[in-house]
């Protein structure tokens, strides 16, 4: 029978293979560090790899180019916009001079089908909503005018086909649950009313091939959290799912095995952790797995490699 043209377009739209491995890097173990920890396609995190690039914390990371990753922004003791590219074999490159407003707590997600990505939000001299796109070759662009509520310490992940979402964060001193969707051309939408408990410094990753999940974080005046919120393949955020694992914030998350994810590291007030919680391809958060690598917080993570 006849196939509608929209279905033809959808069927022919190139879809990048999902990443199989992840990398957790940089952070704060009491002071800023630059080591990295690679995660294999089974979700096993390896021991520390000696750091390359300026030690820093409160940075962001995302995949780019289909099978590589980039870490950018953060604090070396002062705010910076330097970036470090990661090859498809997980090798971290030396610093690339910064582009865009220096800031901290600015997460990132992929968008489109050409390996692009976008960093957004964060804290400069105050909460901000500026964004910086990343080309499929890993080149960071200048600032784009902000959209949505200025805030820092949200989290971000990809969902659907070529789409992304920023959610939660600290706006004006309080935790929020608002989200902002990212189109396949990298356009950030206006605020979407929050669903779930408002909080800052959660982490997020994709799972199930086309969905995402936010988990953990802290709510000012309430305390550290472990609940999660799933995101459908149309970008709809679900209400809270009861928490699993140790409550913590300032952790990181990355996908592995093509359709699963892992949340790892973080802190709860004083203690810093290296524990890990795996996410199944149906979005179920597993109980704690004993940590590997230096316990730390304020790190970032991203997927890389399309080879298992």
Residue ranges and their predicted role:
Residues 1-308:
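Polar, enzyme-active/binding microenvironments
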């Amino acid at each position: 029978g006849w196939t509608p043209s929209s279905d033809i377009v959808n069927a022919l739209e190139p879809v990048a293979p999902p990443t199989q491995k992840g990398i957790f890097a940089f952070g704060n173990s009491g002071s800023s560090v630059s080591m990295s920890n690679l995660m294999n396609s089974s979700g096993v995190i390896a021991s520390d790899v000696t750091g390359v690039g300026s030690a820093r914390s409160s940075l962001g990371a995302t995949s780019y180019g289909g099978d590589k990753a980039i870490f950018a922004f953060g604090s070396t003791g002062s705010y910076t916009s330097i970036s470090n590219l990661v090859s498809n074999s997980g090798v971290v490159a030396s610093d690339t001079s910064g582009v865009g407003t220096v800031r901290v707590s600015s997460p990132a997600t992929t968008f489109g089908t050409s390996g692009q990505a976008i960093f957004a939000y964060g804290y400069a001299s105050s909460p901000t909503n500026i964004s910086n796109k990343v080309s499929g070759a890993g080149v960071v662009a200048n600032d784009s005018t902000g959209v949505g509520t200025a805030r820092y310490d949200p989290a971000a992940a990809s969902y659907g086909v070529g789409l992304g979402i920023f959610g939660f964060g600290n706006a004006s001193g309080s935790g929020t649950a608002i989200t902002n969707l990212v189109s396949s051309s990298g356009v950030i939408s206006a605020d979407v009313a929050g669903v779930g408990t408002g909080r800052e410094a959660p982490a997020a990753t994709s799972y199930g091939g086309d969905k995402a999940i936010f988990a953990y974080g802290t709510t000012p005046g309430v305390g550290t959290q472990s609940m999660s919120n799933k995101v459908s393949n149309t970008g709809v955020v679900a209400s809270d799912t009861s928490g699993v694992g140790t409550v913590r914030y300032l952790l990181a998350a990355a996908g592995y095995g093509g359709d699963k994810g892992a949340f790892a590291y973080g802190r709860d007030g004083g203690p810093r952790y290296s524990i890990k919680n795996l996410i199944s391809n149906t979005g179920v958060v597993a109980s704690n797995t004993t940590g590997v690598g230096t316990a730390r917080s304020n790190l970032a993570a991203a997927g890389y490699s399309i080879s298992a």
